């Protein structure tokens, strides 16, 4: 049981925490029990306009702050974040459901992301182009794009907010973050660590009615850049809204990651890695391995080994023995259970275990012998569900893996150089891990293709997303 007192946060506007003035309030619940934790007060139209006004004012100052000072301020904020890891992790587990170990890891990952961006602030370089005329110079400059509107989800609220906060602030932008209403306290605690080291208004945090917030922020001439992580339908809507107002947008959307397991793969090692990765955060990860295409020669052994997921200890995230917590909400629980039922009706064979009755729990489930037209092969589960299909040739596996609108992450297990070359060139994903799990690190770009979005976060590409380019030709 956590000893951390849970309270829903206020809004951060202009460097001050203030209550939201919207007439509507939302109840935040503990996914492990379904019981209410507190009520969240939302941003009103006046709150949104005040946030826009103050973010514009803050940007005019922050853009002129030298990169070395921006770096130092962010690094001090990161130090505060690390000092508060235990408290923030407890808040995250209470409101989101993931295990305490996973919550601690997420805090560490968020700190690493912001620190990397802080260091990158000192490495934003322009360039000199050889001039065409005597007594002249041609130069290219990089400068901050302007105030940013950022939208982050509930599944990894710290990490996915940190990707946006770190890049925008390091680049010299101010940022208005609309974080997920399901997980408000943990993000507010992280943002507070940064805010204490920044000038007022550089970072602002809002919670509100999503349609009202997105319309107000994206339509405003103050906002110059939009960044969103979330579902494909919402991403499409925000892309249309951004296009209408000619705003640059980065979209990191859904995933349905394929895993190709070749005949020479080490089954025990592959299953051990993939079970850890698949059922982390109860499978609520856009890069979670989900569709397993397994060489027919080892398919039976693979399914038997994967069936050991029934031994995973499912329970409340605060319990030390828990290996997988609940899904985040009753709505998510119902959606995952419905997808399993429809896929079983289509011919899939379920391998699952029992789970606690109270709370929003879904059993870690493997669907074996899945028909290619079963719903789970095309719909993102976003829960603790994996599906397995045998293949007879690598060409067949690649074709089946690509037969899906998503293209975020993919995985390959083999020692064959020929197979690695073929999959790396032909698998339609933004990130590929070979014989491992690492597809998301601060120093490398992360983003998808097809319906998984466009643009990158993290890496130098993620920093570029918050920068504009100016060319100057000077003749003496």
From Swiss-Prot:
Instruction: Provide the residue positions that the database annotates as binding NAD(+).
Output: 154-155, 178-181, 230-231, 253, 380
- Coiled coil (UniProt feature): none
GO MF terms listed in the record are: 4-(hydroxymethyl)benzenesulfonate dehydrogenase activity; succinate-semialdehyde dehydrogenase (NAD+) activity
GO biological process annotation, one example? gamma-aminobutyric acid catabolic process
Where are the active-site residues found?
A: 252, 286
The enzyme class is oxidoreductase
Q: Which Gene3D superfamilies match?
A: Aldehyde Dehydrogenase, Chain A, domain 1, Aldehyde Dehydrogenase, Chain A, domain 2
A Pfam family found in this protein is Aldedh
Q: Which UniProt keywords apply?
A: Aromatic hydrocarbons catabolism, NAD, NADP, Oxidoreductase, Plasmid
* InterPro entries noted in UniProt: Ald_DH/histidinol_DH (IPR016161), Ald_DH_C (IPR016163), Ald_DH_CS_CYS (IPR016160), Ald_DH_N (IPR016162), Aldehyde_DH_dom (IPR015590), Aldehyde_DH_Superfamily (IPR050740)
Q: Which reaction does it catalyse?
A: 4-(hydroxymethyl)benzenesulfonate + NAD(+) = 4-formylbenzenesulfonate + NADH + H(+)
Query: EC?
Result: 1.1.1.257
Q: Which PANTHER family match?
A: SUCCINATE-SEMIALDEHYDE DEHYDROGENASE, MITOCHONDRIAL
Q: What does this protein do?
A: Involved in the toluene-4-sulfonate degradation pathway. Does not discriminate between the sulfonate and the carboxyl substituents and can also be involved in the p-toluenecarboxylate degradation pathway.
Report the family membership. Answer: Belongs to the aldehyde dehydrogenase family.
Subunit (UniProt)? Homodimer.
| Protein name, as recorded | 4-(hydroxymethyl)benzenesulfonate dehydrogenase TsaD1
């Amino acid at each position: 049981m956590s000893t951390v007192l849970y309270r829903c946060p206020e809004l951060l506007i202009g460097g001050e925490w203030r209550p939201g003035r919207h007439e509507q309030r939302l109840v935040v619940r503990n996914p492990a029990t379904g019981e209410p934790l507190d009520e969240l007060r939302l941003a009103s139209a006046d709150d949104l306009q005040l946030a826009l006004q103050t973010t514009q004012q803050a940007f005019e100052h922050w853009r002129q702050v030298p990169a070395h000072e921006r770096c130092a301020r962010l690094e001090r904020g990161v130090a505060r974040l690390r000092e508060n890891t235990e408290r923030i992790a407890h808040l995250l587990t209470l409101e989101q459901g993931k295990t305490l170990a996973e919550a601690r890891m997420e805090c560490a990952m968020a700190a690493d992301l912001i620190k990397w961006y802080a260091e990158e602030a000192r490495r934003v370089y322009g360039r000199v182009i050889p001039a065409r005329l005597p007594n002249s110079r041609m130069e290219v400059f990089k400068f901050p794009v302007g105030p940013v509107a950022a939208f982050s989800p509930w599944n990894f609220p710290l990490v996915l907010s940190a990707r946006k906060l770190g890049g925008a602030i390091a680049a010299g932008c101010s940022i208005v973050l609309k974080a997920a209403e399901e997980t408000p306290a943990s993000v507010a605690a992280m943002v507070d660590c940064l805010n204490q080291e920044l000038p007022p208004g550089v970072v602002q945090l809002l919670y509100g009615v999503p349609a009202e917030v997105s319309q107000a922020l994206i339509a405003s001439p103050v906002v110059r850049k939009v960044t969103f992580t979330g579902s494909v339908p919402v991403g499409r809507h925000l892309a249309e809204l951004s296009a209408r107002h000619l705003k640059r947008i980065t979209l990191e959307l859904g995933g349905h990651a394929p895993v190709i397991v070749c005949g020479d793969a080490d089954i025990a090692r592959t299953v051990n890695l993939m079970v850890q990765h698949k059922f982390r955060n109860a499978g609520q990860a856009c890069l979670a391995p989900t569709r397993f295409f397994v060489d027919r020669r080892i398919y039976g052994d693979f399914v038997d080994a994967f069936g050991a997921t029934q031994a995973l200890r499912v329970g409340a995230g605060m319990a030390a023995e828990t290996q997988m917590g609940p899904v985040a909400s009753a709505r998510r629980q119902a959606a995952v259970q419905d997808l399993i039922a429809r896929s079983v009706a289509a011919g899939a064979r379920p391998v699952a275990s029992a789970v606690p009755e109270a709370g929003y729990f879904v059993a870690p489930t493997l669907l074996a012998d899945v028909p290619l037209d079963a719903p789970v092969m095309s719909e993102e589960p976003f829960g603790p569900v994996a599906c397995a299909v045998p293949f007879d040739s690598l060409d067949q596996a690649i074709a089946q893996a690509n037969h899906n609108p998503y293209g975020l992450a993919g995985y390959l297990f083999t020692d064959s150089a020929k197979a690695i070359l073929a999959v790396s060139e032909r698998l339609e994903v933004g990130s590929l891990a070979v014989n491992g799990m690492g597809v998301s690190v601060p120093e490398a770009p992360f983003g998808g293709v097809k319906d998984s979005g466009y643009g990158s976060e993290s890496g130098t590409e993620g920093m570029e997303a918050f920068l504009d380019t100016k060319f100057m030709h000077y003749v003496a």
